[in-house]
């Protein structure tokens, strides 16, 4: 069978050093390769009589929060970011914990909210921490088009040193069409490359289809397939749960939180019993 090649692809391969790529991609089965360092954990698990932190996110990878509209995904993000920073955040989410985070920069990109609401959310994060954290950098991207949002993120990565955690709330605003397969795959490839090349943890947020738990569009499918962890955010009668929807790691225990009269989310309890592995 004759295979027709795209001439544009042939032109690209002429300038590509595949011997170097092959060397970089080769897996030596005799080499000791350490596990990716944990960036965020939720609770602990037992393994062979010892307790270990249960990872949600690792440096060099990306994770995703999914949920229905107004299900408090952004509140969950606030709990995660404040817990990554530390300080008094353990009083709000005692089972969420940041790792390797000393003096790390946190980039908090919001594509949906107005500057007023984005600022209010950023202040709530610092209220949970208990002090102004100089390395927390929130950005409001609502007025930008999707290309400029991607451009700004690239600028952040290239010009801001020592980033540990980056959030993109919401990732669907970085594409023109969430059902364009090529465009969505390209964006997910960016997430994988950014997280690896800069050795950071990237958190994303996506909506789910009405009446189900599947993330919206081709973008949702691509993100959930490649993400290290997918966390489902659900709210019923004022109580919000974070559930391990998909993960390459050990499944963490689900947790619940409520939003207090002060506007801050606070964990209620572990829903699940401790898991043993």
Task: Locate predicted features.
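C-terminal regions of RecA-like/P-loop NTPase motor modules
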Residues: 1-20, 32, 36, 40-42, ...
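The Walker A/P-loop phosphate-binding site
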Residues: 10-118, 123-125
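Short, solvent-exposed loop/turn segments at secondary-structure junctions
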Residues: 58, 174-178, 208-215
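Phosphate-binding/switch region of NTP-binding enzymes
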Residues: 64-66, 70, 74-75, 185-273
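Alpha-helical scaffold elements adjacent to nucleotide-binding pockets in ATP/GTP-utilizing enzyme cores
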Residues: 79-80, 117-125, 152, 186-190, ...
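Conserved, well-folded catalytic cores of nucleic-acid-processing
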Residues: 83, 87, 125-128, 174-177, ...
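Conserved inter-motif catalytic segment of the P-loop NTP-binding fold
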Residues: 99-182, 262-264, 271-275
């Amino acid at each position: 069978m004759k295979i027709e090649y795209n001439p544009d692809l042939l032109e690209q391969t002429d300038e590509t050093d595949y011997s170097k790529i092959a060397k970089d991609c080769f897996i030596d089965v005799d080499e000791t390769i350490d596990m990716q360092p944990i960036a965020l954990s939720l609770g602990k698990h037992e393994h062979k009589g010892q307790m270990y932190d249960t990872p949600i996110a690792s440096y060099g990878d990306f994770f995703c929060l999914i949920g229905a509209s107004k299900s408090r995904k952004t509140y969950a993000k606030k709990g995660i970011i404040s817990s990554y920073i530390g300080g008094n955040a353990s009083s709000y989410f005692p089972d969420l914990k940041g790792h390797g985070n000393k003096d790390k920069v946190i980039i908090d990109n919001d594509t949906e909210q107005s500057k007023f609401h984005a600022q209010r959310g950023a202040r709530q994060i610092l209220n949970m921490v208990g002090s102004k954290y100089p390395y927390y950098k929130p950005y409001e991207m609502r007025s930008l088009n999707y290309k400029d949002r991607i451009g700004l993120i690239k600028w952040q990565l290239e010009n801001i040193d020592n980033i540990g955690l980056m959030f993109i709330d919401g990732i669907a605003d970085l594409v023109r069409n969430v059902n364009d397969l090529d465009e969505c795959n390209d964006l997910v490839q960016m997430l994988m490359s950014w997280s690896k090349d800069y050795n950071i943890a990237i958190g994303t947020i996506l909506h789910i289809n009405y009446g189900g738990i599947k993330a919206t569009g081709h973008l949702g499918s691509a993100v959930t397939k490649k993400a290290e962890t997918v966390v489902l955010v659900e709210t019923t009668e004022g109580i919000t749960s974070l559930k391990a929807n998909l993960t390459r790691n050990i499944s963490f225990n689900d947790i619940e939180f409520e939003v207090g009269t002060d506007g801050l989310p606070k964990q209620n309890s572990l829903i699940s019993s401790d898991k043993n592995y």
